[in-house]
Amino acid sequence: MKFNRKKMIWIIFGVIIAIIIVIITCYMIVECKASGKTYDMVADVPHREVGLLLGTSPRTPENAPNYYFINRITAIAELYKAGKIDKVIASGGDYSSRPGGGYDELVAMRDSLIDHGIPDSVIILDYDGTRTLNSIVKAKEVYGEDCITLISQKYHNERAIYLASQQGIDAIGYNAKPSHIITKRIKNEGREFLARVKLFVDMILGEKPQFESKKK
């Protein structure tokens, strides 16, 4: 069979276009679902009993301060001091045993929250929050919370709101500021396109959350 180079080019082009369409479609479905459910101003946020703080590392791989972490802490402190939430579920993971040194997200979050004036007595630590899906579902099934305010950057809040809607959870999001470092913003927001595709792939494959079915 004679190789048809022109036909192959068109096939490759078609595949690329199809992939782009899938990526954009997944992104827009999530964004539309979250429309009107995220807030940039603390005064506009409705009161919810619980704020779910989605974890991230306190330091970057270069051991510099992670402004995504810092800004999430600042955001949840703003909510608490404004009376918009009464307690905090800090959801993340313990990576302190990683080779070469790691970190415990929960300890870092708790200490930072206390430093920002949030009492230890209203902070709940969830060590199963290694995935957004785990954090969302555990908030409902273990902690009994089906009406929550999510705290993360806007793109992450939108995806978390979509996940929450699929689990019967009424979620809104308060948007922490992104990093002021442009390269970090481009990297993280670019990765979000693929994260939203993975969200739908996981749904199609029936991916289940994994967490301990008890409070700590």
What are these regions (language model features)?
Residues 28-189:
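A structural signal for short, hydrophobic/glycine-enriched beta-strand patches
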Residues 207-216:
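Short linear elements at protein peripheries
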Residues 186-208:
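A transmembrane-helix-recognition feature enriched in membrane-embedded lipid enzymes
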Residues 2-43:
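N-terminal type II signal-anchor transmembrane helix
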